[in-house]
């Protein structure tokens, strides 16, 4: 589980292009942004996301409540989170069917969802202009997430780390 900023001042990414030439890229000078909170289940290849205007403990509470409703009855979900302030806040309300796991600091490679953000930016959120302000940013984030979920097996291929099944079975 993690969140990614999506906005008009997007990231530049690498693209394949004709040897010896440089592609022209668009770069927007707007400042509107939103935050895509997302969690994935590598085993089932499913995900849940929520687009929110800010990152805070209140926003995290909203996402955890939404995720808790999406977890099948009788199932418990373990979430790998980084050490962001809103992930470790004492005011955070964690539903009973969720457990938060915090890996060591500065280890994003241990969080499967980090590769999802990279994929979304590479495929749908970079090299484009989001005209229309905040609504366009929210629409782009939702469209990118829905396009990802529409690709059969993509979430599983992005997030199924070889060490993950053994780590889950021993805990």
Language model features with spans:
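Acidic, metal-coordinating catalytic cores used for nucleic-acid/nucleotide bond scission
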Residues: 5-7, 55-56, 77-90, 105-110
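Extended, low-complexity cationic-aromatic segments
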Residues: 1-65, 166-171
């Amino acid at each position: 589980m993690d969140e990614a900023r999506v906005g008009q001042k997007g990231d530049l990414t690498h693209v394949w292009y004709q040897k010896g030439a440089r592609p022209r890229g668009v770069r927007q000078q707007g400042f509107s942004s939103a935050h895509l909170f997302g969690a994935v289940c590598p085993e089932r290849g499913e995900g849940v996301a929520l687009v929110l205007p800010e990152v805070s403990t209140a926003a995290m509470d909203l996402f955890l409540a939404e995720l808790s409703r999406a977890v099948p009855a009788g199932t418990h979900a373990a979430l790998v989170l980084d050490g962001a302030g809103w992930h470790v806040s004492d005011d955070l309300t964690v539903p009973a069917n969720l457990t938060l796991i915090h890996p060591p600091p500065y280890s994003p490679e241990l969080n499967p969802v980090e590769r999802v953000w990279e994929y979304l930016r590479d495929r749908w959120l970079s090299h484009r202009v989001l005209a229309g302000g905040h609504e366009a940013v929210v629409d782009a984030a939702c469209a990118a997430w829905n396009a990802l979920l529409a690709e059969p097996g993509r979430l599983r291929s992005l997030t199924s780390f070889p060490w993950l099944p053994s780590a889950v079975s021993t805990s």
